[in-house]
């Protein structure tokens, strides 16, 4: 009998200690712990988590502090200033140039200082803490028709403080510019721990402050700012690129422009805007007041196609005359990769043959008619006959006088228009698919971010593109060209193997020569991603010795001992040092993989695949999707896919004390992964942490043996038949008072959980008792093998009976094959030999039947995915002696039950009563990972149900995970996120295809019913 206890706090990660290993500098730890309320973590594993960001760099920090307030930040900086210890403020760790890794005490501002403090819709402003995500800020102000204008690619996972530190922008910078324009005021902590507020201030007041006390830190800062405005104006005018997209160096041009009255009253500057782009080197921003903009009423998109990338580049400047909100480019490499992606294959297929690149042009408009007119004007001006090419037919009608706006040769071959939200989103998703496609490469050669961010005046893009291509060719490599063509920011990531010394030398040569071209063409070394380790060394070449000296003087005024994120912006970083993968990097897993890894570099390629973007850290409310449920429940870096990848790579590369099987902390970290597979589809790189977890657990079992609880849970398919034979006796342990405590003490089964109830009449018993198939084979339209998964067969035969009723109503001949299960339970416990044996038996039984024309249909989603996907890992290649062709035959002809009904439109062949009920649908994470979750929704809607599909993550039960005592708190914390979504839904009832999900949902409230499987609802609607 379950013991009722209060639900855990969603921030509670359970019984896991988030620190481990040796703690260096205990005196420093003790001193900081006395001074702050937040956590102080200087152990090996915590430092490992913060040694990387989304860049190619890796630097082990001194330690990590999770401040809870500005007072905590001030206390840390005051002490470290006195002791000469560097400090690094950090947000989401999404930096692409290495700004957020350093040998310093890291301040993780996203842990506790992450609130949207207030909003003022009338003034269109908001007050936020630095650790608040941009996505959370937008969610708070969206009901008022407002948003934070800069839209960095990872805005749901990027902190506002990080956006300020980087001076972030995004795809729509043509319309909105950079973050500095929207920072009205900032609370900052200076290097010595002084807390002050930066905002608008008269330059004359700065002069008075500087004269009043020349020895104090703040007056010295004021004095240096005044000196720069007085003495460096001409140099700033001469050396700063005349571009909106420049975030290299310090924001002195903005300061000078304000002083001159270009943004308001002359003689007044806003020091908060000097923080923009300073990368935490001048002060730590703890709070900020930011201005907001209205969400555009209407959007319209045109996709222009070109025969050559240079034609597209030539066309950018003329297109800007039409005042677009965004102009984005994709080259032929990315278009080819997108064509191989099912989601975009049809879009690419509609492009004219020979298309080498496309420009996505988006307009903001006052209404549909205005949007269509803007697109029509663009098409009339830019698409047409050049080089004897006939003008394409188009339904667009340009306004009078719109044609030949630019008097430039028309270069676009074809145009596709998108005015409805769905098609616009598809075009944008295709453009944004570029980075995930590039990052999914598992070879040692990777598309490295180091010179991807230069900003060039649009009229010089063709020359820049040609020269860049020549530089790449000289260095024996290539790159893709994509992203923000409108403001002149092409994301170009050369293919480099940083493990090879020659490639690193080529990387430096490319950066050096490209920087020369950038300076000559009047551009910036960084138009978006900042300086950091990758580009700081090129700022001197960009700005010259005099301004470089002024940068250093300003840095010294703010930070006399250079303790705030030292090395960045104007320091001595060398881009070829501190690379995550270098010539000294070593890979030794300590075990051979037990599964097939059909990717380049095998399991090593997967271990090294995470590039650190932080996509796994997105909140459910703003990010959606499945990844990563344990992070969302605990908000701990180590519980994110990125954290686990860092731990695993650290153990394998020797940066942590032991290999994965010998390091108990790493084993525990992997054990807390729920195996949802969300990262396989939601992670831009496609990191398959569930598969890596299975490998690590299997290797651990091989070395240390399998404990009793793991063996019992992993052998559930073998034990369940006995449980049903002994029912109801076998169900007594779940009903006797006090039995839960005994089970927890003896086996580690959470006392709060109700154990599965075994049915004395199994699905197979029922099927045989009714005489087997209800539709004769010779009269059937289809033949189905209903796979007897363990959950449907022994604990929930009702769903299986419903499946039989539905399939037979659609005139299917149904049989239940003689197999003992899919092997999912042992697989989820890392018992891969046992899982492989079950998979082999299933394939050997099913393959001949499928070859004779029968389809395999599975009620339980996780078992369906086992056959469709995981069998390849267990049986393909050298993993087993089962022919790959047999595995493929089974996998390609296996369906989830609702998938099968939808794929063959069986519901349209069934007489259904029109239901009036509305349903809240929670899909199974494994189906979402294989993009098969939509089938049930479509079928139920066609059947007449109203369906609200939740954009939910894992339920938290995750098979046996939620039954394990040490995981109960985490399981319920994950579940609480789902429960809140259910509570907000308007459905009359909840449906869920997963047995574990239904168990978790039943426990959301006292007396809550166990939700049915969707097929049960479909069966209930049978006439």
Predicted features by range, described:
Residues 1-90, 94-481, 490-527, 537-622, ...:
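Noncatalytic alpha-helical scaffold of FAD-dependent oxidoreductases
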Residues 44-45, 102, 354-358, 422, ...:
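Short Gly/Ser/Thr- and Asp/Glu-enriched loop/turn motifs at secondary-structure junctions
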Residues 89-91, 109, 130, 152, ...:
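Active-site proximal loops enriched in glycine and acidic residues that flank catalytic Cys/His/Asp
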Residues 115, 121-126, 298-302, 449-451, ...:
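Short beta-alpha connecting loops at secondary-structure transitions
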Residues 156, 460, 481-488, 503-506, ...:
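Secondary-structure capping and boundary motifs in well-ordered enzyme cores
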Residues 418, 432-481, 505-509, 609-657, ...:
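Non-catalytic terminal/interface segments that mediate subunit docking, oligomerization
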Residues 559, 691, 695-1023:
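Iron-sulfur cluster-binding electron-transfer modules in prokaryotic oxidoreductases
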Residues 582-613, 617-720, 836-842, 888, ...:
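Ferredoxin-type iron-sulfur electron-transfer modules in oxidoreductases and energy-metabolism complexes
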């Amino acid at each position: 009998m379950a013991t009722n206890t209060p639900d855990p706090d969603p921030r509670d990660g359970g019984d896991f200690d988030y620190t481990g290993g040796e703690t260096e500098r205990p005196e420093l730890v003790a001193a900081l712990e006395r001074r702050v309320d937040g956590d102080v973590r200087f152990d090996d594993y915590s430092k490992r988590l913060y040694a990387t960001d989304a860049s190619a760099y890796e630097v082990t920090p001194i330690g990590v502090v999770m401040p809870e307030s500005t007072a905590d930040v001030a206390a840390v900086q005051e002490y470290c200033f006195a002791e000469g210890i560097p400090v690094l403020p950090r947000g989401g760790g999404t930096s692409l140039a290495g700004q957020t890794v350093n040998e310093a005490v890291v301040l993780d501002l996203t842990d506790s200082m992450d609130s949207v403090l207030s909003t003022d819709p009338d003034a269109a402003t908001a007050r936020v803490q630095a650790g608040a995500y941009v996505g959370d800020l937008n969610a708070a102000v969206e009901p008022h028709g407002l948003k934070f204008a800069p839209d960095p690619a990872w805005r749901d996972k990027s902190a506002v403080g990080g956006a300020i530190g980087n001076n972030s922008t995004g795809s729509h910078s043509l319309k909105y510019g950079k973050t500095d324009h929207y920072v009205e005021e900032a609370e900052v902590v200076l290097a010595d721990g002084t807390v002050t507020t930066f905002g608008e201030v008269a330059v004359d007041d700065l002069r008075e402050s500087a004269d009043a006390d020349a020895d104090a830190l703040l007056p010295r800062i004021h004095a240096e700012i005044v000196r720069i405005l007085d003495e460096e104006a001409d140099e700033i005018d001469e050396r700063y690129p005349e571009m909106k997209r420049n975030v290299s160096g310090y924001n002195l041009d903005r300061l000078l422009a304000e002083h001159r009255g270009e943004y308001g009253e002359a003689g007044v500057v806003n020091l908060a805007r000097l923080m923009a782009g300073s990368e935490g080197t001048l002060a730590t921003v703890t709070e900020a007041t930011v201005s907001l903009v209205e969400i555009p009423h209407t959007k319209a998109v045109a996709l222009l196609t070109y025969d050559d990338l240079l034609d597209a580049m030539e066309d950018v400047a003329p297109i800007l005359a039409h005042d677009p909100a965004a102009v984005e480019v994709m080259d032929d490499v990315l278009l080819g990769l997108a064509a191989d992606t099912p989601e975009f294959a049809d879009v690419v297929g509609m492009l004219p043959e020979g298309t080498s690149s496309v420009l996505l042009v988006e307009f903001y408009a006052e209404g549909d008619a205005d949007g269509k007119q803007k697109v029509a004007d663009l098409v009339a001006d830019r698409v047409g006959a050049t080089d004897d090419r006939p003008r394409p037919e188009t339904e667009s009608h340009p306004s009078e006088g719109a044609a030949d706006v630019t008097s430039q040769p028309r270069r676009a071959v074809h145009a596709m228009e998108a005015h409805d939200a769905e098609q616009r989103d598809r075009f944008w998703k295709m453009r944004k698919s570029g980075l995930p496609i590039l990052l999914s490469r598992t070879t040692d050669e990777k598309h490295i971010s180091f010179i991807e961010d230069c900003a060039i005046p649009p009229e010089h893009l063709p020359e820049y593109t040609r020269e860049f291509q020549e530089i790449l060719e000289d260095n024996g490599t290539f790159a893709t060209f994509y992203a923000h063509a409108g403001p002149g920011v092409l994301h170009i990531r050369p293919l480099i193997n940083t493990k090879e010394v020659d490639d690193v030398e080529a990387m430096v040569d490319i950066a050096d020569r490209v920087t020369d071209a950038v300076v000559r063409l009047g551009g910036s070394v960084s138009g978006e991603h900042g300086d950091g380790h990758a580009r700081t060394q090129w700022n001197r070449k960009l700005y010259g010795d005099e301004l470089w000296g002024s940068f250093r003087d300003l840095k010294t005024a703010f930070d006399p001992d250079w303790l705030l994120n030292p090395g960045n912006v104007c320091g001595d970083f060398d881009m070829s040092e501190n690379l995550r993968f270098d010539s000294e990097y070593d890979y030794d897993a300590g075990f051979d993989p037990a599964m097939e890894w059909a990717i380049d570099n095998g399991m090593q390629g997967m271990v090294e695949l995470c590039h650190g973007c932080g996509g796994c850290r997105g909140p459910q409310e703003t990010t959606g999707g499945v990844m990563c449920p344990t992070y969302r429940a605990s908000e701990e870096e180590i519980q994110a896919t990125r954290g686990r990848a860092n731990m695993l790579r650290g153990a394998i590369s020797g940066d942590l004390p032991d290999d994965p099987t010998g390091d108990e902390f790493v084993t525990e970290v992997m054990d807390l992964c729920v195996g949802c597979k969300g990262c396989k589809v939601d992670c831009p790189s496609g990191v398959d942490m569930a598969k890596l977890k299975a490998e690590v657990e299997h290797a651990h079992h091989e070395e240390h043996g399998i404990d009793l609880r793991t063996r019992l849970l992993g052998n559930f398919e073998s034990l369940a038949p006995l449980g049903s034979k002994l029912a109801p006796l076998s169900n007594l342990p779940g009903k006797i008072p006090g039995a839960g405590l005994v089970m927890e003490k003896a086996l580690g089964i959470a006392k709060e959980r109700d154990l599965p109830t075994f049915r004395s009449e199994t699905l197979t018993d029922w099927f045989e008792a009714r005489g087997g198939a209800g539709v004769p084979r010779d009269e059937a339209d289809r033949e189905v093998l209903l796979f007897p998964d363990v959950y449907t067969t022994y604990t929930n035969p009702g769903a299986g009976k419903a499946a039989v009723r539905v399939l037979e109503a659609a005139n299917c001949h149904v049989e239940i094959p003689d197999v003992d299960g899919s092997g999912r339970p042992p697989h989820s416990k890392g018992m891969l030999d046992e899982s492989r044996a079950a998979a082999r038996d299933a394939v050997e039984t099913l393959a001949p039947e499928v070859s004779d024309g029968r389809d395999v249909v599975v009620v339980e989603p996780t078992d369906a995915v086992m056959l469709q996907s995981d069998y390849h890992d267990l049986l393909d290649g050298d993993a087993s002696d089962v022919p790959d062709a047999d595995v493929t035959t089974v996998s390609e002809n296996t369906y989830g039950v609702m998938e099968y009904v939808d794929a063959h439109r069986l519901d349209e062949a069934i007489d259904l009563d029109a239901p009036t009920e509305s349903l809240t649908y929670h899909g199974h994470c494994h189906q979402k990972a294989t993009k098969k979750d939509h089938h049930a929704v479509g079928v139920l809607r066609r059947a007449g149900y109203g369906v609200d599909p939740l954009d939910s993550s894992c339920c938290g039960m995750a098979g046996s995970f939620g039954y394990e005592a040490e995981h109960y708190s985490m399981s319920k914390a994950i579940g609480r996120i789902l429960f809140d979504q259910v509570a907000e839904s308007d459905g009359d009832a909840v449906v869920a295809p997963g047995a574990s999900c239904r168990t978790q949902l039943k426990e959301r409230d006292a007396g809550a019913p166990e939700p049915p499987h969707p097929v049960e609802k479909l069966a209930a609607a049978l006439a």
